[in-house]
Amino acid sequence: MTDSENGTLVPAAIAEPDLRDPLLYVNRELSWIDFNQRVLEEALDSAAHPLLERVKFLSIFSSNLDEFFMIRVAGLDDQCAAGINERSVDGLTPIEMLERIRERVIGQLRQRNACFFDDILPALKRKGIEFVSVSSLSVEQQQLLQHYFRKEVFPVLTPLAFDTGHPFPFMSNLSLNLAIELEDEESGAIKFARVKVPGILSRIIRLDQIEGLGFDDGRIRLLWLEDLVEHNLDQLFPKMRILQCHPFRIIRDADIEIEEDEAGDLLESIEQGVRSRRYGKVVRLDINPDMPHSIRSLLVKNLETYERNVYEIGGVLGMSALMELLKIDRPDLKDELFVPNNPLDDKRTADIFAEMRSGDMLLHHPYDSFKPVVDLIWQAARDPDVLSIKQTLYRVGSNSPVVKALMFAAEQRKQVAVLVELKARFDEENNILWARSLEDAGAHVVYGLPGLKTHAKLTMIVRREQEGLRHYLHLGTGNYNTVTARIYTDYSYLTTDPVLADDVTELFNSLTGYSKHREYRSLIVSPLNMRRWIMEMIRHEVDHQKHTGNGRIVMKMNALVDEEIIRALYRASMAGVKIDLAIRGICCLKPGIPGISENIRVVSVIGRFLEHSRVYYFNNGDHARIFLGSADIMPRNLDKRVETLFPVIEPRLVESIKSDLELTLSDNRKSWEMQPDGTYIRKRGGRPAVDSQRLFMRRSLRRKKNIKKKVKGL
């Protein structure tokens, strides 16, 4: 352009890219669909896992999809019903999202069915595990099986008619049902009935374990429960002729909405909300393609749903039930048993307090055992010098040694304060039971702050010692759940750091009382300051990049959704900061876009264990700062939950976490890399071969062997 005063040429200003451009973002829901596709790929890959582990991934894919419909699709359905056409950050309206979800899911279900019927079933048969049908059995076997049906199944069934005298039967969420058309043998009248396949019984029947059937050749024969019910319908409908029978399965809206400000008793309100899940609107109706239009339309009309919510599945409905096959005792068809390392096994005494006083401890689960965490709480419960235990509980499991330790401590007259998050989705009933049990034991139980879920993972133990009161802390990235601790990757940080202890004390006071503490010296807390802190840390790396050229950010988490922080990462990339993101699930950021995100790499590791840890690494001018915690980068985590991030200071632990991150990022066997268009490509090949989870297991086993040698030498 020309300078108007002197006529000289000056360069035109380079336009700043519009970082709100929808093309720069991946749709949240479709990104989740992509994640579940990566789970499905584990089942499809015959070289990746033993046979029954592939079955497990089919089950996980299916149960994931069910939950997605119960929550996310249900929400989109609500928006469509309310006439909401607001576009998401990527430019899609709710109805457009539903259309794309349906298209993607139908393709995935076809893949899943082809995998199960054309690949896995024949492979199972070759290994001596075979699904059979009732009709394939001999007449004598069918008669014996009929006796089994009368004794074990018939008493649980409830046939329900539908006509002018019988209202359309209620059908609960996730229920598998049989739609039956009947003819009255006396009047010739055509009737309709429904039979629910009882969820209280095993969905898969082991015929080889039923006495008298003659299956004693060592092979395992399996039968679907619905097949047995269908072949014995004449016992449920005497003097009726069975014209046709078709299975169907429904999924309902399961999202609970509680107006906490109006709820007089939160626990009671949550209980009512859990019960209401049974009555949520139908968001998916699974049928087989051969269901006639007459029955299909009858179901759609009376379930008050839409044709767009009907999915012709084909084959077996409700494949999450395949998890039952993992009960089969065939170690040759499963992953080799892995027993984690317990770093305290080499100690003469099991005094965890003494270990923590000697230095901070970092456990990397499941490669390191969760047992030291459980032992810490039990030791505190039994120790007469321990005065109080405070803990947050989100998902703890149905038979929790952690909660039992807290109950024991309360019974010993220790001050026990527990925040039980009643709103932990699909764990509400379990948490309600534990909350009542803790109260009965004498613990102080609170349910958190109104309008906020408490997702932070914190334990604080106060102990009287010669020098005065000392605080022992456990801070984690995962739940206090001994079952998931064996299959989720997480970190546990055990410390007596006094500054961190002061912060945790203040946070517990905020959670259990009316404290309005606003400043923390070490802890990062949402919704108070976490969003601001992450933005500041990203800006600091931009400054380091400008001055020293060594700006680097590594983040590991389950999901990256927040638009404001994605824009900040884009700006950091534009400034030259190298950014590595290990995001297992949803990622709305697009890497590798020239001029915008070319310095960002996104990978997703899907393997034997579920990647669950949250790690935030900032190079900080080669003086690395590492924070661990409970928060993903999603609006809900930053604005609507109580989350914590905590610093790891001790150099040896910082180096350990850095090493873990580099190993995860170098994975070229179980890792997927996101492309600039938002799609993923499996990282395969490359030398040396790096399967990060397998290498973490090997490292754990080496440490275990070293501990055994050390113990022998004591």
Swiss-Prot record:
Reactions accelerated catalytically: [phosphate](n) + ATP = [phosphate](n+1) + ADP
Pfam families: PP_kinase, PP_kinase_C, PP_kinase_C_1, PP_kinase_N
Cited InterPro entries: PP_kinase (IPR003414), PP_kinase_C_1 (IPR041108), PP_kinase_middle (IPR024953), PP_kinase_middle_dom_sf (IPR036830), PPK_C_dom2 (IPR025200), PPK_N_dom (IPR025198), PPK_N_dom_sf (IPR036832)
Binding residues annotated for Mg(2+), in chain numbering: R395, R425
Modification after translation: An intermediate of this reaction is the autophosphorylated ppk in which a phosphate is covalently linked to a histidine residue through a N-P bond.
Active-site residues, Swiss-Prot/TrEMBL: H455 (phosphohistidine intermediate)
Alphabetic keyword roster: ATP-binding, Kinase, Magnesium, Metal-binding, Nucleotide-binding, Phosphoprotein, Transferase
SUPFAM superfamilies, alphabetized: Phospholipase D/nuclease, PHP14-like, PPK N-terminal domain-like
CDD domains tied to this protein: PLDc_PaPPK1_C1_like (cd09165), PLDc_PaPPK1_C2_like (cd09168)
Name recorded for this polypeptide: Polyphosphate kinase 2
